[in-house]
């Protein structure tokens, strides 16, 4: 397990609103313990997850979003 900004298949972040429960819900659905809306340089507001399973993608540094 690991912590990180949860990624969509194209190495794109899940955008969010500070203070909303959306990231916590998303992270728990994906097997993490919790989540919150954070700020990722180069991506903007993005969901951060705690204790995600290894089979759930997180943002790869240096890779662009390929949407």
Curated annotation (Swiss-Prot):
SUPFAM superfamilies found in the cross-reference section: Scorpion toxin-like (SSF57095)
Coiled coil (UniProt feature): none
Listed name of the protein: Alpha-like toxin Lqh3
Disulphide linkage map: 12-65, 16-37, 23-47, 27-49
Any one Gene Ontology BP term: defense response
Residue numbers bearing the Serine amide modification: 67
Domain of life: Eukaryota
Cellular component annotations (GO), alphabetically ordered: extracellular region
Species this chain originates from: Leiurus hebraeus
Pfam assignment, any one: Toxin_3
